[in-house]
Amino acid sequence: MSVINSFTQHTINLTRKALRLGSDFVHPVHDDTPDEPDYLSNADVPVETNIALPHSDDWDDGHLTVTDIDPATGLLTTSTEGNPPLDEGTSIYDLYADRAERMGDEPLYTYKSGNDWVTVTANEFLADVRAVAKGLIHYGLKKGDAVAFMCRTSYDWDLTDAAIMACGGVLATIYDTDSAEQIRNIVNNSDARLLIVQDTDMRKKADGAVEECPSLEHIITIETGGLDEIKAYGTTVSDEELHERIDSVKKTDLCSIVYTSGSTAAPKGVEMTHEHYCQTALNLPAYMPDLLHDKRNTILLFLPQAHSFARAINYIVVSSNVRIYIATGIKTLISDLQVAKPTLMIVVPRVLEKVYNAASQKAGHGPKGVVFASAVVAAQNYMKEVSANGKAGALTRTRRAAFDPIVYSSLREVLGGRAKWIVAGGAPLDPELLAFFRGAGVPVYEGYGLTETTAPCAFNPLGTPFHAGSVGIAFPGFSLRIAEDGEIQVKGRAVFPRYHKNDEATELSFTEDGWYATGDLGRIDNDGFLYITGRKKDLIITAGGKNVSPGPIEEVIQRCEFVSQALVLGDKRPFISALVTLDEKSLRPWLAAKGLDENMSLEDAARNAAVRAEVQQWVNQANEGVSRAESVRKFIILPEEFTQENGLMTASMKVIRPKVIKRYSTLLNTQMYTKRK
């Protein structure tokens, strides 16, 4: 064995020991699949569900995804086969009942209560659901009645949601960060009879919002024993009455009105039926049985479940054999990861950015910082070669392997050490960041979806060859096409039917032949992989008529070590500009390393010449990838970040561009775009 091969094999052995890899995930250091450790063997045989589905073995994998020109429209279209239509009586309650029948005494949810982690089996959860559902019936909740729900991601969220679904109610989602005005708008738009909030702080906010809500009859606070009170009332409701209600629910019944984050005076409520969520939930386990039928696999939920993405993932995992851990919050995410050790994770790019920044900050600017920077380049170069050639060269593989025991393995351990499939969605992920994580052995895959598509409508299945910048193929049961103007359009059984009480918005959202127009721009390659290139509403048209997509430019500027956010502007303006915010935690050590006052205020840092020069370097790099007309000619560094608290970011961590422009309109008009004299 050569010295290179011996060194590489030694690194492989260290990597396998650290990752405990299973057969689902081949580590990129080597080409041949390792012998599978006992810990993650496929000893568990896929379990047949009681909801009628074709087993994945019946599918012809070579024909699952078809990409072709639609002869009727001439548009490039790609489709992935999904499950056949569900029975008329299928409901979300069936997902939980089926899990209990298959794995009743095995863990379903594990969550933190005080200082202790509590595990609830599928049978115990179903009993909880039935008890709360009976209580809701006692409260007078009729089939089709709306319940507005304001709660953080928690066991209480899943329990309350499932109970409302069981008795045929309609859950109207409220983010835990929503304002009193937004609460009022959602309660009134949904005609909610009941408002359930998680804690006393939310109750105070709700009390100040509901005076003008004529439909509302009750407000219940979970923190002060609200769910126990509901259960107590439910003891007067018979099993027969509950069963009658459960059996009355059909797949076409409305089950939820999901309000898009950032709703204001005119909220857009997306109507979802039981069929939408059940189709999504049942399609993925059938498509990826090796991952989702292994009982030893786990997932950690921490994204807001008021968002359709996180909620759909919960239903998907309930329909599988995977165990669910619920994080106590973003602040405790790292410690929660060490408990859950998830094999599956659903994240937004902002989370991965934070993980990367924390690792970079910990490495510092000395020798460790040099090693980390070299490891980043090695991982990215590795994935670039894999993307271009299907395989990295021997020297590139060896360089990458050298950093595995000293850098990459630590990064994987931060994420729990067992990750097989991490899906990033909700916003574009910087391709350089994706290449780093994939090259480091962190299996990050991009996906794409919207509230209107019950979240995922495109995804990269486990083991998908690396397609840099692609959000994957059509999700099972979906068809995607690209319109003449580049807009992505979607069709499938999980696409929403309408916006609640908003016929005008509904009509504008669908084409004449029934495809949902997403508002996103993209392209589909010959293999059926979708690439997002921008958003129609974000598309900047300068005063000179140049069309500019801000996303790629923003991604490069945000690679600056201490930049938190970059917002590229210039619509109907003479040139392209950018607003830049600072990540204070990353900024302090950078200032110290440069011999500057690390305790200077953010206002001073925003004006500091060295800080501006560093940002300018990244602006210059971004400009190298675009034409002169698309180049950022001027930028302003702001002394505050765009956050949910100041109303400039949604709960799903997307910057609200119109609100930023409005907030800084004076700054833009007097300093960025000064009129010529």
Label every PLM stretch briefly.
Residues 2-61, 139, 166-232, 614:
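Structural core segment of the AMP-binding/adenylate-forming
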Residues 474-542, 559:
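Conserved ATP-binding/catalytic segment of the ANL
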Residues 84, 108-162, 179-184, 231-235, ...:
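Conserved AMP-binding/adenylate-forming core of the ANL superfamily
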Residues 565-568, 574, 616-677:
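Conserved C-terminal "lid"/linker of ANL adenylate-forming enzymes
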Residues 278-298, 305-408, 418:
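Conserved AMP-binding/adenylation subdomain of ANL enzymes
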Residues 24-28, 201-251, 359-410:
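ANL superfamily adenylate-forming
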Residues 104-107, 221, 235-259, 266, ...:
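Conserved pre-ATP/AMP-binding loop-to-beta segment of ANL
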Residues 119-123, 255-281:
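Conserved AMP-binding A3 loop
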